[in-house]
Curated annotation (Swiss-Prot):
GO terms for cellular component: membrane. It holds the Pfam family DUF716. The keyword Cytoplasm does not apply. It is found in: Membrane. Belongs to the TMEM45 family. It is a multi-pass membrane protein. This is Transmembrane protein 45B. InterPro entries: DUF716 (IPR006904), TMEM45 (IPR042127). It comes from Xenopus tropicalis (Western clawed frog).
């Protein structure tokens, strides 16, 4: 959709997943340091299955929104009367959602007893991100300078994420790569919203001069600020997760010590009773 909603929708999807990953991966990493956490591993597997279902569902919502909004193409690619293309921008967004939907389906299939190759889920996600970058690279040709520039900045986050994910195919459970991907996903989410506010101002706000080089300079600086905020969010979430895990570990240790003490006292009582019965 060539409007504010068309950028807010994918921005919201990326933001939700980026924020979720910024909590999930630190939690998984810090819990992996605790011995005997088999139950947690099963829990994470279920969470990743749910994540795949949500990814496929979000992609389906995006496809339906792009195709069946009042001014959408309604699944028509070519106009039958003059043989012209119909709403190609909507079709590009639909294609992006399609590949993210495929990634979600692969995530789901990974947890079925099909013996799929290890890393296939990351590979499918990496392909989806590459397709997104390819589509947006040719999305704004022959458009005003500011429009081209603000979308080209998005490609930094897109292809940076794609490289990270492709490395994850071979290096699973690497916390640095996972956190890097999470930060770039948050950046994508906030930047989609920023594109919407710049190109389609709300509430009668003044329009941006698309040819002013000063605006191009500010948008570049603004992109760096967005990533700084993303890194701050990552740091805050990691710190909160660390405190929660540390507190939980401390409580578990207290409970374990209490149980050991109770069992020890119980053993001593039983031993004294047995000793008393032997004397009789």
């Amino acid at each position: 959709m060539a409007n504010f909603k068309g950028h807010a929708l994918p921005g919201s999807f990326f933001l939700v997943f980026g924020l979720w990953w910024s909590v999930k991966y630190p939690l998984k990493y810090l819990n992996s340091k605790v011995k005997g956490n088999c139950r947690s591993n099963k829990c994470y597997e279920r969470l990743e299955l749910i994540e795949g279902i949500l990814k496929a569902a979000f992609a389906l919502i995006g496809i339906l929104a792009e195709q069946f909004v009042p001014d959408g193409p309604h699944m028509h690619l070519v106009n039958g009367e003059d043989h012209s293309w119909v709403k190609l921008m909507n079709w590009q967004h639909t294609t992006m959602y399609l590949f993210y939907g495929i990634s979600g389906v692969v995530d789901i299939l990974t947890f079925l007893p099909l013996n799929l190759p290890r890393g296939l889920d990351r590979l499918s996600l990496g392909i989806a991100v590459i397709i997104e970058g390819l589509l947006f690279y040719y999305h704004v040709h022959n458009r005003p300078a500011l429009d081209q520039h603000i979308h080209s900045l998005l490609l930094i986050a897109v292809f940076g994420g794609a490289i990270s994910i492709m490395i994850e195919v071979f290096m699973r459970n690497d916390i640095v790569l996972e956190l890097f991907r999470s930060s770039l996903t948050i950046l994508q989410g906030t930047w989609f919203w920023q594109i919407g506010f710049v190109l389609y101002p709300l509430g009668g706000a003044p329009e941006w001069d698309q040819t002013d080089h000063g605006n191009v300079m500010f948008i570049t600086m603004c992109f760096c600020w967005h990533y700084a905020v993303a890194l701050l969010i990552m740091a805050i979430n990691y710190s909160l997760v660390y405190c929660c895990v540390k507190r939980h570990k401390k409580l578990s240790s207290v409970v374990d010590n209490s149980l050991k003490k109770i069992n020890s006292n119980k053993t001593e009582v039983e031993a004294s009773l047995l000793a008393g019965s032997d004397e009789e």
